[in-house]
């Protein structure tokens, strides 16, 4: 017998068998926890868990699971037990009532590289301190101050569309909205004039879109062997692209150097820097309750770019798609635009924010396509909520995409119907059925900012142009299975001059 296996010594065999034993024993450990708790859900495969059981697109998978298992179910993301919840009473408790006590933190993959202290990743007191300092940068007063900057960029956007409409070009809508988002974010965050609308090859777009493209092998490896996370971390493995993070770090450091003293633009970066001098009672590299360290400022600024770019862009892309495929909605919206700003007049902030139908259209588009398909929280302690025990350290996941397409909450959920949000119908929307920006103290900080920049671009464009479907338009859309909610292939439409 041993003669057939000449290459392996006894020691090698022992090692190999030990490894196989470890592999098998380790594999089964996390599974069965939901069965014990009496929570339904798909049966896991070892190591792989229940990933992609019903559909390869993870958020479509959530829709199928919700149909099958109801409002609470258990899944295993590779080896990690994840409790999915769409029950409104539980959502209220998790996201709002017990946010500060049991559910303060998001799931942390620990491979955050430089961004470990970004507000979306920071935990507990750290998070609360950073969030409190950032909040004033996103009040409606501050956003109103940024409006003229946004308008300038939106003006460039519409100007760049003129020739495209004139030549009857087929456009990949992301190619126009991506540069718009980048330019708005860079201007409002750092007063940086990128003008990527007119210089589409600018490296900043490339880096901004790269950051959230998590490397799949790392995702799978950390999923299979979460106990190796500290090792990966020490080896410098990160989910966020290091070249892209470094790119923004250099840009920002240069801006800060140039901005010594005299100039004081009202951008997000300056608001953070100003908070440093306000809380001036010890060294600036030491955190205190009133201010951010230099590193923290850097992380917030980078996170703002990255979190804002992709989400605002896809929101605009889906709006264009929904309007092109629902021309009667677009017509009604254009009527509202024309009566609010007669004779293609300049868009004003207050009037824009008061447009009712526009708000319904944007909300309905975000209902069907919320950029973040899932939210999550970690339970700090074992806690019983609405009769369901949630164990310490368990991931609670809110499948927003599935929630917002739940046929019990949204009749004919696949239909694009802005009137769901009209004054008359709004009352029938159940609380906690709609959360494209999350809810509670840990909701999206940039919500109002995003709403303004999205509405402005949409109104400016629809004043002079209409979107229309063409042969190249994919209907229905095939969805992307990586990252944020998005189309697998670029959405292509045509522009018509009004
Ligand atoms: C935007 O602002 C720049 C100066 O900051 C100006 O030259 C340009 O004409 C403006 N563009 C639009 C479309 O308002
Ligand atoms: C802190 O305040 C002192 C005076 O009280 C001032 O000299 C110093 O420049 C301030 N430091 C910072 C970082 O603003
Ligand atoms: C649209 O959604 C936002 C938040 O997502 C909300 O504040 C607003 O009231 C909604 N508008 C309507 C008309 O429902
Ligand atoms: C829309 O068209 C009118 C003339 O038809 C023009 O004056 C205006 O600048 C255009 N607006 C935009 C945002 O392109």
List PLM regions with ranges.
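Cytochrome P450 heme-binding "Cys pocket" and the immediately downstream C-terminal segment
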Residues: 327-329, 447-484
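Conserved cytochrome P450 K-helix/beta-meander segment immediately N-terminal to the heme-binding cysteine loop
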Residues: 398-425
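Cytochrome P450 heme-thiolate monooxygenase catalytic core
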Residues: 33, 103-115, 122, 145-314, ...
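Conserved cytochrome P450 K-helix E-x-x-R motif and the immediately C-terminal K′/meander segment
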Residues: 50-70, 250, 254, 347-386, ...
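N-terminal membrane-proximal hinge/A-helix region immediately C-terminal to the signal-anchor transmembrane segment
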Residues: 3-117, 123-129, 151-159, 244, ...
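Cytochrome P450 heme-thiolate "Cys pocket" and heme-binding signature region
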Residues: 302, 307, 386, 423-454, ...
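C-terminal helix/juxtamembrane-tail motif
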Residues: 1-6, 274, 483-498
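Classical protein tyrosine phosphatase
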Residues: 41, 84-86, 92-94, 192-195, ...
């Amino acid at each position: 017998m041993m003669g057939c296996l000449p290459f392996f010594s006894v020691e090698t065999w022992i090692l190999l068998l030990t490894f196989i034993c470890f592999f098998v024993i380790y594999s089964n450990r996390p599974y069965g926890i939901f069965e014990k708790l009496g929570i339904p859900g798909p049966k896991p495969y070892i190591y792989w868990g229940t990933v992609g059981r019903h559909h390869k697109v993870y958020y479509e998978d959530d829709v199928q699971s919700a149909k099958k298992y109801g409002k609470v179910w258990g899944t295993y993301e590779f080896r990690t037990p994840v409790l999915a919840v769409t029950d409104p009473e539980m959502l209220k408790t998790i996201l709002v009532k017990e946010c500060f006590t049991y559910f303060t933190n998001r799931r942390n993959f620990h491979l955050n590289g430089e961004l470990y202290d970004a507000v979306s990743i920071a935990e507990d007191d750290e998070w609360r301190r950073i969030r409190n300092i950032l909040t004033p940068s996103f009040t409606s007063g501050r956003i109103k101050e940024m409006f003229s900057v946004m308008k300038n960029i939106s003006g460039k956007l519409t100007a760049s569309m003129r020739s495209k409409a004139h030549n009857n070009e087929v456009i990949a809508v992301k190619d126009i909205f991506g540069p718009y988002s980048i330019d708005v974010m860079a201007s409002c965050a750092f007063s940086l004039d990128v003008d990527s609308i007119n210089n589409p090859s600018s490296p900043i777009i490339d880096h901004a879109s790269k950051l959230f493209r998590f490397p799949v092998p790392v995702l799978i490896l950390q999923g299979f062997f979460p106990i190796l996370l500290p090792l990966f971390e020490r080896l410098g493995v990160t989910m966020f692209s290091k070249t892209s993070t470094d790119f923004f770090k250099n840009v920002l450091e240069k801006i800060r150097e140039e901005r010594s003293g005299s100039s004081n633009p009202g951008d997000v970066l300056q608001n953070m820097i100003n908070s440093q001098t306000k809380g001036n009672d010890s060294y600036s590299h030491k955190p205190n309750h009133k201010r951010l360290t230099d590193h923290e400022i850097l992380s917030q600024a980078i996170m703002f770019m990255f979190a804002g770019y992709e989400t605002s862009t896809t929101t605009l892309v889906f709006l264009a798609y929904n309007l092109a495929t629902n021309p009667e909605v677009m017509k009604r919206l254009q009527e509202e635009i024309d009566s609010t700003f007669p004779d293609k007049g300049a868009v004003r902030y207050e009037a824009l924010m008061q447009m009712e139908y526009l708000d319904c259209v944007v909300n309905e588009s975000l209902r069907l396509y919320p950029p973040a398909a899932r939210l999550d929280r970690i339970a700090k302690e074992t806690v019983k909520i609405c009769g369901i025990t949630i164990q310490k350290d368990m991931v609670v996941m809110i499948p927003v995409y599935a929630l917002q397409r739940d046929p019990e909450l949204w009749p004919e959920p696949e239909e694009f119907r802005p009137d769901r949000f009209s004054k008359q119908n709004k009352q029938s929307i159940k609380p906690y059925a709609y959360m494209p920006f999350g809810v509670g103290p840990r909701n999206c900080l940039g919500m109002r900012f995003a709403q303004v920049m999205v509405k402005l671009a949409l109104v400016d464009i629809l004043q002079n142009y209409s979107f229309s479907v063409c042969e190249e338009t994919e209907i229905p859309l095939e969805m992307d299975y990586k990252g944020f909610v998005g189309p697998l292939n670029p959405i292509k439409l045509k522009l018509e001059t009004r």
